[in-house]
Amino acid sequence: MQQKMLRILEFDKVKEQLAEHASSALGLEKIAALVPSSDLDEVAVWLEETDEAAAVLRLRGYVPLDGVVDIRSHLKRAAIGGVLSPIELLEVAATAAASRQMKQLIMSLHDEHGGLARLADYADELAEVPALEEDIRRSIDDHGEVLDTASDRLRSLRGQIRAAEARIREKLESIIRSPSAQKRLSDAIITIRNDRYVIPVKQEYRSAYGGIVHDQSASGATLFIEPQVVVELNNALREARAKEKQEIERILRELSAKVAEHDEPLKRAVEALAHFDFLFAKAKYARRLQAAKPAVNNRGYLRFLQARHPLIDQDKAVPNDIVLGGDYTTIVITGPNTGGKTVTLKTVGLLTIMAQAGLFIPAADGSEAAVFRSVFADIGDEQSIEQSLSTFSSHMVNIVDILRHVDEESLVLFDELGAGTDPQEGAALAIAILDEVHGRGARTVATTHYPELKAYGYNRPGVVNASVEFDTETLRPTYKLLIGIPGRSNAFDISRRLGLDERIIERAKVQVSAESHSVENMIASLERSKKQAEEDEARAHSAREEAERLRAEWEQKLEELEDKKAEQLAEAAQKATDIIRAAEREAERIINELRRLQKEKQAEVKEHELIAAKQRLAAAVPVVEKRKKTKKATARHAFQSGDEVKVTSLNQKGYLLEKVSEDEWQVQLGILKMKIHERDLEYIGSAPAKEVTPIATVKGKDAHVSLELDLRGERYEDALVRLEKYIDDAVLAGYPRVSIIHGKGTGALRQGVQQFLKQHRAVKSFRFGAANEGGTGVTVVELK
């Protein structure tokens, strides 16, 4: 892209504003070299990088670039064995710190939020050399002075220097405080000449102190003498300072050598930091302009929504929608020379090359920019938009050059096409030039004040007229672009507003042809119609937004209701679960209590105790509403004594003993009898009568047989003897079912018990206990 065109469109001023946001000379160097690209893929990458940098600013608000310095020359000197100064070493440390901090920032944000793939690639090039940073910071202070802590020898030498200086001052102060000092000295001070401590002695007392004369005053009346008593001390001080200088040189050489060790990674880091500074300058500039990332294409289609000229105060700039390359490829902006047309023209060109340079554009989201191979502009005599137009010859030189190169991948901008010559000939030339450029497929925006071009957009496919709105009340352009409406002359309205006599205005109107007058009236009518259409569209847009707002509001309310419903259902389910769990715990406690009573030696469970336990167990069971399907199935079956049923609330099987009320049954559940409501029962099938035989009871304290036999801890042989006797006693007692507790353990006793039961003639069947009966630690035996 020609530098001349960039200068005409004032891209250099955009770069000047962009440079205000750079943090280092490295960033400024990149900005100075910035030129638009005509490669679509490259432009897309540049915009993506700017977008990622803008995302970092949104997430963090800052980037660690303040300490970045161009240290490439430092690295080069260090690499060939040169010694860096303390300030240069500090700049290396500061740049290394910025590299480390930037890498940590980008990588942490990329890991946390994602979406920073391109910046993460650049961050991979950033060096992390904390040891080098620490060595430099430990040796040199912020003012570039080598610290005592740089080495033990330097600390020792500086201690010697301070001690020598103190002794010298002590001796010289004793001289200037002596009674004779007032007479012999020009002033009672200690000063330094040639790096040696001296005192000002009057000329006539030159020999009073002996020593060496190092200087004299301009008049010669005062001599600066190093008294003999401090000559040796000054010599020792000078020697110590020479050694200090040598040690400092050694330290700087050592640090420079360490810098040289990291030469390559630091070089790559400098290049990466330069690019980061460049990208974040673009992101900061976008924030300043309230700019947006445009989509890009190579179809020659641009759509700038609410576009503003970037060099005009953004609070005062009038936004315009500008579309080109769709239904029409040429826009002809007509109307009087008010200045608004040129601003619009430059806005199109400048926003295009900004996008092609990877910059966000001052336009609304949803904007789209075309990537052109060439952008041509004939706008004045390379002057700013505030200055006057150039001559016809200057225009024509530019136009001839443009016509040599223009093609379908070009954007062409003509300002006041055909101006500066005879109006009739100028208008004819303008039409011919537009036809040529339009015919080559270029995208064109042209401004003109010739009325002959007002009809141009109506007679050519792919061409549209436009104008810049003019406020006849304020006599100023509003800078609002009106697409589809040609500009009209406002000379009569302006003259009337300025006080010109109405008779003169009417006389002037007579001189205007009827055709021109008709065209002006038509344009005025178009303006009114367009304004009305825009107002209608604005009202429709407002109504649509209100409808969207209401829809979103109701969707939110519906979502809140659904959430509340789900929350209430979850709460109810939790309450039900809590009730059932409480009932299970109470039932378990009651059963355990019964088992404890039965296991006690010689203990009998009295009838009233058993009844009380049954009642507590029944009270602990919640009444649970079953599903409709279950209720219907239950209603269809007529329960009878002896039916095998399932108590759904307890998930236990049992047998119906007798109906105790209209809708309640007494149910045998293991060793317990309970009253259960019919709605809590599920029919399983009929059962043998003896399955529901009441638990037999042998009267008398000595004749009581427990329903359980606990063999845990017994020796194998003793356990089998007890088991055989227990089965016989249970059969005699008439028990239909008993439980043998053998524990889980190694399984030896369990296997022995079950092997014995297989062979016993009185055993009908046996099984492991259910989860609430003791599991595999218990065998439940059905007796014949």
UniProtKB/Swiss-Prot annotation:
One of its GO terms (molecular function) is endonuclease activity. HAMAP family: MutS2. Residues 709-784 form the Smr domain. ATP binds at residues 335-342. It comes from the Bacteria. Gene3D superfamilies: 3.30.1370.110, P-loop containing nucleotide triphosphate hydrolases. Keywords: ATP-binding, DNA-binding, Endonuclease, Hydrolase, Nuclease, Nucleotide-binding, RNA-binding, rRNA-binding. Residues 527-546 are annotated as: Disordered. GO terms for biological process: mismatch repair; negative regulation of DNA recombination; rescue of stalled ribosome. It holds the Pfam family MSSS. This is Endonuclease MutS2. The gene is mutS2. Homodimer. Binds to stalled ribosomes, contacting rRNA. Its EC number is 3.1.-.-, 3.6.4.-. Belongs to the DNA mismatch repair MutS family. MutS2 subfamily. Endonuclease that is involved in the suppression of homologous recombination and thus may have a key role in the control of bacterial genetic diversity. Acts as a ribosome collision sensor, splitting the ribosome into its 2 subunits. Detects stalled/collided 70S ribosomes which it binds and splits by an ATP-hydrolysis driven conformational change. Acts upstream of the ribosome quality control system (RQC), a ribosome-associated complex that mediates the extraction of incompletely synthesized nascent chains from stalled ribosomes and their subsequent degradation. Probably generates substrates for RQC. Transmembrane segments: none annotated. CDD domains: ABC_MutS2, ATP-synt_Fo_b. It comes from Geobacillus thermodenitrificans (strain NG80-2).
